Curated annotation (Swiss-Prot):
Gene3D superfamilies: Velvet domain. Keywords: Nucleus, Sporulation, Transcription, Transcription regulation, Virulence. Residues 45-54 have a biased composition (Pro residues). The lineage of its organism: Eukaryota, Fungi, Dikarya, Ascomycota, Pezizomycotina. InterPro entries: Velvet, Velvet_dom, Velvet_dom_sf. Residues 79-97 have a biased composition (Low complexity). This is Sexual development regulator VELC.
Amino acid sequence: MPVHFNQSVGMPPARDGARPPPIKGGLMGKLIPATYSPNGRHPRIAPPPPPTPPAGAGAGAGAAPPQRQLLQHSPTTAPGPRRPSNPSSPQHPQQPGIDRFPQIIPYQHEQPQRRPSRQQYSASPPVDYSFGKGPKQSGLDQSSSTSSSVSPKQEMKQMSIHNLLSSGDQDDQDDKSINNSNTARASSASLASLASPRSVLPPAAMPSPSPSFSTSEYHLHVRQQPVAARSCGFGERDRRVIDPPPIVQMTIDDPSATPDQMQQRLRHPFSVVHCSIYNETGEEDNSAMPEDYRQQRRLMGTLVASPFVGKDENGEDGCFFCFPDLSCRTPGSFRLKFSLVVINPADMRQGLRTPIAATAMSDVLVVYNAKDFPGMQASTPLTRKLKEQGCLISIKKGNEKGGGGGGGGPSGSRDQYSDDEYDDDGGGGSGRAGKRKRIRRS
């Protein structure tokens, strides 16, 4: 059976003749049965039944209609008592089928919790130890100890904004006074350290001692001067070395050192000598090529040498640095500069540099073209002596010619690289010697 919603709204009785306010709960109605018309188009709504008067009420004009129950705003859920009717105010009859309004419970707002006091957040109070006196607590500890005995009213008074601001200012003043005292102590300590003749650093700040040697004790001497060389151009296959190979000797001047200490310094494996090429006067570094050439080095080969401790041709011990693999790309007159660096393994850290201990400059070296090259010289006694002791250096018999063109013909090319039995680059030395003998016989 279809039902319809009747929008008859009940209104609470007004006070003092004023119009009652609308109910916020929404529209209220009653379910009324309906019947259909014979044609089936529109439903016919049955009229509402007449209101039934309450029992015991008379038919006279003095009979008052029933009163509705007012909303009781009480925090409890039980319905409140009925409000007595006021004869002077207009009354509204209660419609049948409509129950009394449910009681509305107001929303209970939660009271915000009070922020804890400043003393609850404070950590353990600092203790000031002074010489000749016992430990003394700070003002914060005293305030926290006294705050436990105050009443709640006094505590609320202490938590007022004025008191908090004044206490914060007092704390700032205390911090400033502490900082000023610390800075005064630091400044007095720094002045005392400057005034003292010997200022000793604490053990944690002192650097660790490193076995570094004095740079003024080392000296370099060129024992074997370079004389001539053939320019090798910009290729890598037809390369000619400087003749004779430069040999540099390192000496140490230290009267207080014992012979064992001197041998230890001479055999130091981290002593390195670097070679660079300069102009004829020795004032300008010519390692870089001019702009019209390709970006290559002028001096090529092994530019760094390690120490070799042995005896020279006179039988004396020494520390030697040999450069048997040096070549020059362009012809001209140059000088070779040798720089000694003594590396200390204890100071090998990133960002540090090792100073140059000693330097030495060679005599003038002349680099010839292929046609003007006079030829190779025979190896010196010093070179042969070092070779016998195990030094990696080549031995040359040499074929120096005075007319030039030593490297032009095929025989000159063979003679300038004719090696004897001590040559490390050999392997074909005996064959070349046999060829040379056959050529001479013919």
